[in-house]
């Protein structure tokens, strides 16, 4: 339960208590239950239509929030995962492969968090090593060769900052991806589905179209990190989240992303299938908007997008 959801938790407890009493004592409490359920719906709408930036940060970090592998079966047909960077090893924090979107072969790449403690250790909490970014680039170059559109799912706190990752060239692997992605001659469409953290997000985020789920975040540093750097106090993360403009609607207003995809009431985890279908619809629409461009025009469109990205507000 998140802090701002406490009023909802209390109403749900009352509903469960009344239902239990109704079953145990064979009394009719349905009218009271109906009133509380109506109150719960009203309060849920009120809370989720007035979320603060820090509230959205908490939602983006939820353990139960859908991951790349949760969405893929609903969006793409016959997905086949491909492994390895052909240099060092496979990185489970970065998944990729080939699937079909409405009958068309596409390449799918995404950061992958774990679903529980054991899985998170295996997936390194969604923080990819250099071999993860090199695997992603290998699949992107393969997609370019076979003229397959590329779809990427961004969901990471950042690239892994450990000693071994640095020794194997973490910064070089991300920098190379930025250079190579800028000139790919096939459509690239990216979506931030959770946290989009720093260079770790950009390593698969240089796209013709960049989308965000409405409760996702996109930033150069975490609010806690920014607060520690700016004010020497990580406890001021809530203020930092508001100052940094890291939420989807703020970033859309700044011209950094192309579209915001709505989430089910309560967040994407409340209805994964509904959320996935909304993403699929956006993917199809964005891909259609690029169909008239030649291969050279697609690369130039992406290059110019990032040359002119963002805005300055005094």
Swiss-Prot record:
One of its GO terms (molecular function) is ATP binding. It holds the Pfam family ACCA. It is found in: Cytoplasm. InterPro entries: Acetyl_CoA_COase_a_su (IPR001095), ClpP/crotonase-like_dom_sf (IPR029045), COA_CT_C (IPR011763). Gene3D superfamilies: 2-enoyl-CoA Hydratase, Chain A, domain 1 (3.90.226.10). Pathway: Lipid metabolism; malonyl-CoA biosynthesis; malonyl-CoA from acetyl-CoA: step 1/1. Residues 32-289 form the CoA carboxyltransferase C-terminal domain. It catalyses: N(6)-carboxybiotinyl-L-lysyl-[protein] + acetyl-CoA = N(6)-biotinyl-L-lysyl-[protein] + malonyl-CoA. PROSITE patterns: COA_CT_CTER. One of its GO terms (biological process) is malonyl-CoA biosynthetic process. Keywords: ATP-binding, Cytoplasm, Fatty acid biosynthesis, Fatty acid metabolism, Lipid biosynthesis, Lipid metabolism, Nucleotide-binding, Transferase. GO terms for cellular component: acetyl-CoA carboxylase complex. Its EC number is 2.1.3.15. SUPFAM superfamilies: ClpP/crotonase. It comes from the Bacteria. It is an enzyme of class 2 (transferase). Component of the acetyl coenzyme A carboxylase (ACC) complex. First, biotin carboxylase catalyzes the carboxylation of biotin on its carrier protein (BCCP) and then the CO(2) group is transferred by the carboxyltransferase to acetyl-CoA to form malonyl-CoA. NCBIfam families: accA, AccA_sub, PRK05724.1. Acetyl-CoA carboxylase is a heterohexamer composed of biotin carboxyl carrier protein (AccB), biotin carboxylase (AccC) and two subunits each of ACCase subunit alpha (AccA) and ACCase subunit beta (AccD). Belongs to the AccA family. This is Acetyl-coenzyme A carboxylase carboxyl transferase subunit alpha. It comes from Staphylococcus aureus (strain JH9).
């Amino acid at each position: 339960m998140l802090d701002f959801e406490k009023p909802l938790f209390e109403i749900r407890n009352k509903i469960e208590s009344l239902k239990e009493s109704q079953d145990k004592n064979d009394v009719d409490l349905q009218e009271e239950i109906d009133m509380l359920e109506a109150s719960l719906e009203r309060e849920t709408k009120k809370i989720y239509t007035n979320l603060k930036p820090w509230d959205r940060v908490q939602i983006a970090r939820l353990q139960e929030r859908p991951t790349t592998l949760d969405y893929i079966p609903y969006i793409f047909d016959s997905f086949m995962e491909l492994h390895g960077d052909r240099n060092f090893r496979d990185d489970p924090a970065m998944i990729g492969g080939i699937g079909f979107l409405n009958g068309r072969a596409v390449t799918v790449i995404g950061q992958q968090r774990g679903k529980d403690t054991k899985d998170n250790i295996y997936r390194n909490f969604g923080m990819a090593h250099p071999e993860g970014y090199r695997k992603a680039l290998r699949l992107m170059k393969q997609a370019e060769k076979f003229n397959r559109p590329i779809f990427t799912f961004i969901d990471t706190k950042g690239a892994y900052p450990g000693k071994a990752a640095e020794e194997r060239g973490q910064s070089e692997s991300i920098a190379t991806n930025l250079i190579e992605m800028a000139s790919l001659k096939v459509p690239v469409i990216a979506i931030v589905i959770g946290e989009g953290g720093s260079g770790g997000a950009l390593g698969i985020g240089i796209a013709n179209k960049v989308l965000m789920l409405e409760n996702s975040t996109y930033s150069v540093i975490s609010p806690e990190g920014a607060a520690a750097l700016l004010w020497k106090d990580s406890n001021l993360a809530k203020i930092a989240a508001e100052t940094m403009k890291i939420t989807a609607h703020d970033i859309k207003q700044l011209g950094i992303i192309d579209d915001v995809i709505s989430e089910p009431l309560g967040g994407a985890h409340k209805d994964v299938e509904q959320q996935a279908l909304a993403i699929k619809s956006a993917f199809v629409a964005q891909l259609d908007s690029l169909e008239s461009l030649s291969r050279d025009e697609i690369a130039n469109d992406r290059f110019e997008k990032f040359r002119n990205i963002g805005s300055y507000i005094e």
